Amino acid sequence: MSILGDALTDARVLDLFAGSGALGLEALSRGAASASFVELNPPSLHALEQNIAALGVAEVVTVHRADAIRFAERLPPGAFDVVLADPPYTADHAARLVAHFRRNPFGRILSVEHRSDLELDGDSTRRYGDTAITFCHAP
């Protein structure tokens, strides 16, 4: 997360495939103004809601129970400043998300975590063992 640096300051953050909310909650701890979380799995949603309550950040978050790809496909350009995504590695979600961002940049920066052997059409990629993070920037 530190690689995003000042981009998180006062940012509107979207956490796709949020799970427990770790990425979006960390963004808030690093100065983001707000975070929206998108998660479909009920146990993950429960954990997310517990984490939001435990951290006392309910006033600056929104939780959407939705399919993350479909949610992203409905967003207008520039809807968020920073988009964080940690999709399941077993599906093509990362590639679909990057392709959609290239057509419709719904944020200034997209950060997608994925398998390190997967090549995505990003602006830069950092590899850490079996995991990689690809970054895309809006034009």
Walk through the language-model features, giving the residues of each.
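Class I S-adenosyl-L-methionine-dependent methyltransferase catalytic core
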Residues: M1-P139
